Amino acid sequence: MSADNESRTGRRAAGGGTSNRQWWPNQLNLHILHQHSALSNPMGGDFNYADEFRKLDLAAVKKDLHALMTDSQEWWPADWGHYGGLFIRMAWHSAGTYRMGDGRGGAGSGSQRLAPLNSWPDNVNLDKARRLLWPIKQKYGRKISWADLMILAGNCALESMGFRIFGFGGGRVDVWEPEEDIYWGSEDTWLGDKRYSGDRDLENPLAAVQMGLIYVNPEGPNGEPDPVASGRDVRETFARMAMNDEETVALVAGGHTFGKCHGAGPATHVGPEPEAAPLEDQGLGWKSTFRSGKGGDAIGSGLEGAWKPNPTTWDMGYLKVLFKYEWELVKSPAGANQWLAKDVADEDMVVDAHDPSKKRRPMMTTADLSLRFDPIYEPIARRYLANPEEFADAFARAWFKLTHRDMGPRSRYLGPDVPAEELIWQDPVPAVTHQLIDRQDIAALKGTILASGLSIADLVATAWASASTFRGSDKRGGANGARIRLAPQKDWAVNQPARLATVLQALEGIRQEFNNAQSGGKQVSLADLIVLGGCAAVEQAAKKAGHDVTVPFTPGRADASQEHTDAASFTVLEPVADGFRNYQKAKYAVTAEELLIDRAQLLTLTAPEMTVLIGGMRVLNANYGQSKHGVFTRQPETLTNDFFVNLLDMGTVWQPTAADKDLFEGRDRVSGELKWTGTRVDLIFGSNSQLRAVAEVYGCADSQEKFLNDFVAAWNKVMNLDRFDLA
């Protein structure tokens, strides 16, 4: 067959065709549990980024970055001969996708270089910033990730323009495929805003106002130039990104001290974004046919101009101009709503970025003007204007928080520029300064705990409640710190406060008795004791099933204080649902099984790990409220594979108890006798074909030992998710 004939037959490559997801749009997405495997990572399984970063000459990298700032390239000329504004925007937009609702987004994975972020409208022309960085990345290779380099470039941009930064911590590890677990919104058009309902209520966990934007629409809500209404959007969005009003004003005013917006001509001249660009453009997008398409002819956001004179110098110009002048609404050359200062003094005129013979009036976006006209922002901005040192410190701290918020505790930061000051948003836990318990102590404490009168279910549920707050997204939560004994965690409904208080009181008594009996400085923390209690309970439950297993335990956790716990910031860690405890706080638009997958992904669990944990937690009787839903066993608190055996039993017929199909009854197929009750979370392991395949492994007659070993391994993983000292 000729090549032409073969082409006409419509031959297709592997991976094409109608996908399962297209056939069944509501199919459970288990792929998010199996992202970022070694199969997609070119660095190899032995690569340790932290070790490589420690070999890096950070001072040399910074020197090269400083030199780059003024090394203007013909293919993408620097505004005023300085790339500082471009790199600040790149770093800001890398970090600015973070939202505290689920901890996802942020700068920690270098995802700006991948879809969809590399092609968001708000990231227009940041592809050029990353290409400008490529020679430096190429030079230092594996010793610095793209994720770290993008933030470091933003820091060096600030320094090169006269600003003193707060510090820098390395340690961000690149991913090699898009982060598909992140819900960016349900809109199917750029700048769509289906995420709102009611009186501009923004859908959780989203923070940005429209699809493809990092923060707010700079022209105002839905493009309407209303500074007061914009202030409401700014406050909501920045709050969801973990910033208070003072931090918000500092970030906006500080960031807009530098650089300019680009809107030299109509957006119709701009070509497709990087993911849609033709092959020959080699990953660069937004090619413009407007004149030269670059420099003074560049088209980006559609807004045009700089906020203040001297856009490559740190000074108070932004706030001075903001309050000094009245502002008139105009259209940019690209047709965007923006504001220009009226009757501008010559000293405040802005020299054109590419033609020093021309001067421009300062501009503001509608969002900028919210700092002047919002009743809360305005006095903060005026205070900063009157106190330059306070403003500089506020911006430095807010910028550091912005760029490090998703990295977890300070102990994860790498490099010589990590600031010494410990900040409350880092969820500080005291250093362990005492001698740790040894193997004999561990065995003795296990015996004491099991003899305390606390049940296996009590101990398992408490250890799980403590450890499972961890979020792999922003590395918050976990058992270290024992914050389960502090507000707000001790009062969360999912933790059954009365029962929790009883368990903690008993464990605290054991802790005090043990510590008081020591003479050589050896101590045990409550954080360690909570986890140890869970491990002892799992071992006891396995013993009841006729098996001797040892659950790994490594001491070294410490107890945090209420003083060093920002209770308000911890409220977002409260589970709206925890399928592992068969808990759901309320009725939601998404199904219980989808919420389970979401939580499993935050716990960095695979589908097999999630499956074996569910089966074990059910027979351990660890449900919220001691409910019997999903407890498919006649011998609770005994670690068997009964959950899987009975779920897969064809002698049982399942029917929903109500129209909402949230709760189900399992009856004997012949007699109709009620055998079990279960939730959607329980039944999904028999319904979903992929999860059923895994469940069948654990339901086999010869699987008890494998079930035990796999459960212990998954349990140990969850208990140690925040033990970064063990990595």
From Swiss-Prot:
The reaction(s) this protein catalyses: H2O2 + AH2 = A + 2 H2O; 2 H2O2 = O2 + 2 H2O
Cross-referenced Pfam families: peroxidase
Cofactor annotation comment: Binds 1 heme b (iron(II)-protoporphyrin IX) group per dimer.
Cellular component GO terms, alphabetical: cytosol
Domain of life: Bacteria
Gene Ontology terms describing biological process: cellular response to hydrogen peroxide; hydrogen peroxide catabolic process
Cofactors demanded by this protein: heme b
Residues annotated as site: Transition state stabilizer: R89
SUPFAM superfamilies: Heme-dependent peroxidases
Transmembrane segment boundaries: none
Similarity field: Belongs to the peroxidase family. Peroxidase/catalase subfamily.
NCBIfam families (UniProt xref): cat_per_HPI, PRK15061.1
Protein name, per record: Catalase-peroxidase
Species for this entry: Geobacter sulfurreducens (strain ATCC 51573 / DSM 12127 / PCA)
Gene that encodes it: katG
